[in-house]
């Protein structure tokens, strides 16, 4: 069938990519993904992160993703924003958020530093240029009001509250403890997911924090994991719609 043929081609292509990356590892002496097999590492490697976000072809902790991210953060950043010196020559909010998505998925708390950096770069109307001049903080390339950047911001906020990982829904993995310490109720949704729309609330309650959700599932309810940063992960029991996680306010 045509579907089986597509699957075969995808497997063969993935095998070619893996072989190429093995050769790159031997050449560079590190598990990194440059923009091309014979290219040095530079800011163009940002495109290789698509294997983790948004495609999720590579696992969350694949060293090829994480070492590439570390390279970009150490060598291609300005005031915690991703600085793209290939053509763009500016800080890229939407690509900074791509890195943040990789870190969020891997459970790396640095994701929030990047979110804050992008928030600080927003215009008074809540918009971002496609590339931002490092001195003036105004636009220096591309769209003045970059819709892609706005979309990535929405997706970042969405994934902080709810994101898919295989056959699971991960809730609250991007809700930092500083937000919980404000002792204010938070809510998000109804947010679209591959399992159906879901509405989420987060409520601090003394020494605990309560995560609750309601979903309009397309089929049966998926496996749900509540995973606040720095707190124990909790696998929800089916059909409960609520998880209580112990939270020490002094933490």
At which residue positions do the language-model features occur?
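Active-site neighborhood of glycoside hydrolase catalytic domains
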Residues: 1-27, 59-60
